[in-house]
Regions:
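Short, low-complexity N-terminal intrinsically disordered segments enriched in polar/charged residues
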Residues: 1-30, 128-131
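A solvent-exposed, acidic/Ser-Thr-rich amphipathic alpha-helical stretch
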Residues: 23, 29-79
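Hydrophobic pocket/interface hotspot
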Residues: 9-12, 24-25, 32, 50, ...
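A beta-strand edge to alpha-helix "cap/lid" segment located at domain peripheries
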Residues: 1-4, 59-131
Length: 131
C-alpha cells in the first residue's frame, strides 16, 4: 500500500515536533518549490529551490524565532495537495517579545516526496513583536 500525501505531511510534522530536521528533509524532493511569505528581513522568507536550501531554511529559523508552541491542527486532504491549518507561539529574537499566530501551510506531494510548500502566517503579529 502506498503512502498518501496526508501521511507524508503528517510524518514531516511528527519529525519536526521531535526536532528531527533530517527526518523532515528525507521527505522533501531534491528539487522543490519551497516558499514562505513574511517580512523580507526574516531569513526564512522567500523562495528556496533545493533540499539543501530547505535545510538552510530550517537552520535560519532559530536565529530569529524561539518557537515555544507549534500545533498543526487540521489536515485538509486534496489528493496530491494538503493544506494544514495550525497555530504557534513564538518569542522573537532578539528581545524575546512573544507573539501568537495561526498559520496556513500548503503542500504538494508526488512520489512520496514534498515537491512544494507554501507557508503563511500573521506577519503583522510577527512585525509587532520585532518592533
Amino acid at each position: 500500500m502506498s503512502v498518501t500525501a496526508v501521511q507524508v505531511v503528517q510524518q514531516a510534522y511528527q519529525a519536526f515536533g521531535r526536532g528531527d530536521v533530517p527526518g523532515v528533509l528525507a521527505l522533501v524532493a531534491e528539487q522543490v518549490d519551497w516558499r514562505f511569505c513574511g517580512a523580507r528581513r526574516l531569513p526564512y522568507t522567500g523562495a528556496f529551490k533545493t533540499r539543501a536550501d530547505v535545510a538552510r531554511w530550517f537552520a535560519s529559523i532559530p536565529e530569529v524565532d524561539d518557537i515555544q508552541g507549534f500545533e498543526p491542527r487540521e489536515f485538509i486532504d486534496g489528493g496530491d495537495h494538503v493544506t494544514v491549518l495550525g497555530w504557534e507561539r513564538t518569542a522573537a529574537r532578539p528581545g524575546g517579545k512573544v507573539f501568537e499566530t495561526e498559520w496556513v501551510h500548503v503542500f504538494t506531494v508526488r512520489g512520496g516526496k514534498i515537491v512544494r510548500f507554501w507557508g503563511m502566517y500573521d506577519t503583522e503579529a510577527s512585525a509587532a513583536a520585532r518592533g
